[in-house]
C-alpha cells in the first residue's frame, strides 16, 4: 500500500525513465485500505504524469473481484485490461487455500470476469497459478473459462498469464507436489497458443532468462522487463525490504538488457498501446485478430514505439541494434501506403515528435 499519491507519482516517473509505456496496477483486498476510490484516484494520478518524453499510455488493473458497478467505474477511469487470476479452478482446493476473507467465495471470484464484461470492460486477462492443483485440471479450467467468455460475450480473454509456483517469502516451491517441470510448462504454453490463438500470452520475471527464451518460441507474446515486486521498488535507489516482495524475481535484467536480448533473438520489442486508444478492444479486436488484419497495425506500431524507446532511453548498443532491425522490418511492411506513412512517422520521431499510431 502506498501512503500517498506522491509515492505513486515517484514510482511512475521511475518507470517512465526506464522507458515503460504501460503498467499493471496491483492492489490488495483490504476493504478499507484499498477501496475502489483509492484505486480510481491512483489511476488518475498515473495517467496525469508526463515526465520528459515519458507517459504511461495504458494502465492495466489487477484488483480483487468486485461488483458490476465498480467495474463500470474502472472502465470510465480508462483502464486497459482488467486482470484477475483464478489461482486454481478446483473448488475444494481453492476453498482450502482461502477459508476466510474477501477471496473465500469461490463462485464470486470465478464469475468476476462476467461481471467485468457486464460493467463494460471488454479486455480481460485470466490465468491460473500452475502448481496449486494438478496442471491438467487447471489447464482445462482455463480453456473452458476462455470458451465461456467468448460464447457469452463474443469476446475471449485479451490476455492469458501462465505463472507457476515459485519461491517467495515463507514459500518453498518444493512444498507443492503439483509444481510443474520446465517441460510441462513449455507444453502448456504451446497448447494454449494453439487453442486460443487470438490471445496475448504473458510471462513474468518469475521465470529465468533461459525459460523465457524457450517459451517465446512457443507462443508467449508479452514479457516484463526490469520488474520489481516490492512496494516502492522502482523509486528506491536500493531495493527495499524483501518482506514486501510478492515473489522472487528470477530474471533480474534491466529493461534495456531485455530489449537488447530480444533484438539479438530477432524479435521486435514493442511498446505499443494503440489498440486500446483507438477503440480496438473487445469484439472489434477479436475480429481483427482472427482475420489477421491486426498485422496491418501491429507491425508498424511496434516499429514506431521501438523507435521512441531507442531515441529516449536505450543504451548505444541497444540503439544500434534496434535501428538496424527497424530499417530491415520497415521494408517488409506489405501495404505500400502504410509503409510510406510509417517511414515518415519514424523520421518525425527521430526529429523529436512522439506518439504516432495506426
Regions found by a protein language model. Name each.
Residues 27, 81, 107-171, 181-210, ...:
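Conserved C-terminal portion of the radical SAM core fold
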Residues 37-41, 97-101, 138-142, 218, ...:
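Short low-complexity, flexible loop/linker segments enriched in glycine and/or proline
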Residues 64, 102-106, 132, 136, ...:
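Hydrophobic alpha-helical scaffolding
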Residues 94-97, 171-175:
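Short acidic, glycine/proline-rich loop/turn micro-motifs
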Residues 213, 218-221, 227-358:
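Radical SAM enzyme core and accessory elements
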Amino acid at each position: 500500500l502506498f501512503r500517498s499519491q506522491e509515492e505513486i507519482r515517484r514510482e511512475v516517473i521511475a518507470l517512465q525513465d526506464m522507458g515503460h509505456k504501460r503498467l499493471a496496477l496491483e492492489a490488495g483486498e483490504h476493504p478499507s485500505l484499498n477501496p475502489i476510490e483509492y484505486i480510481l484516484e491512483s489511476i488518475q494520478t498515473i495517467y496525469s504524469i508526463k515526465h520528459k518524453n515519458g507517459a504511461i499510455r495504458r494502465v492495466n488493473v489487477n484488483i480483487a473481484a468486485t461488483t458490476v458497478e465498480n467495474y463500470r467505474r474502472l472502465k470510465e477511469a480508462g483502464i486497459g485490461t482488467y486482470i484477475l487470476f483464478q489461482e486454481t479452478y478446483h473448488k475444494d482446493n481453492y476453498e482450502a487455500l482461502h477459508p476466510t476473507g474477501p477471496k473465500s467465495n469461490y463462485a464470486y471470484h470465478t464469475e468476476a470476469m462476467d461481471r467485468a464484461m457486464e460493467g463494460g470492460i471488454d479486455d480481460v486477462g485470466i490465468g491460473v497459478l500452475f502448481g496449486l492443483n494438478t496442471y491438467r485440471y487447471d489447464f482445462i479450467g482455463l480453456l473452458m473459462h476462455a470458451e465461456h467468455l467468448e460464447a457469452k460475450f463474443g469476446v475471449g480473454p485479451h490476455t492469458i498469464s501462465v505463472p507457476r509456483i515459485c519461491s517467495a517469502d515463507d514459500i518453498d516451491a518444493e512444498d507443492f507436489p503439483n509444481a510443474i517441470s520446465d517441460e510441462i510448462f513449455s507444453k502448456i504454453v504451446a497448447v494454449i497458443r494453439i487453442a486460443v490463438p487470438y490471445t496475448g500470452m504473458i510471462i513474468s520475471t518469475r521465470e529465468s532468462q533461459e525459460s523465457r527464451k524457450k517459451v517465446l518460441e512457443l507462443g508467449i507474446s508479452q514479457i516484463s522487463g526490469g520488474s520489481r515486486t516490492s512496494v516502492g521498488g522502482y523509486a528506491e535507489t536500493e531495493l527495499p525490504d524483501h518482506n514486501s516482495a510478492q515473489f522472487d524475481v528470477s530474471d533480474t535484467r534491466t529493461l534495456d538488457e531485455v530489449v537488447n536480448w530480444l533484438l539479438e533473438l530477432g524479435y521486435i520489442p514493442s511498446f505499443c498501446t494503440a489498440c486500446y486508444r483507438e477503440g480496438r478492444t473487445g469484439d472489434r479486436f477479436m475480429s481483427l485478430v482472427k482475420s489477421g488484419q491486426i498485422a496491418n497495425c501491429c507491425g508498424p506500431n511496434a516499429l514506431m514505439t521501438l523507435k521512441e524507446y531507442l531515441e529516449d532511453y536505450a543504451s548505444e548498443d541497444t540503439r544500434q541494434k534496434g535501428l538496424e532491425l527497424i530499417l530491415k522490418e520497415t521494408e517488409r511492411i506489405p501495404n505500400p501506403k502504410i509503409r510510406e506513412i510509417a517511414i515518415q512517422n519514424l523520421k518525425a520521431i527521430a526529429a523529436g515528435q512522439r506518439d504516432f499510431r495506426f
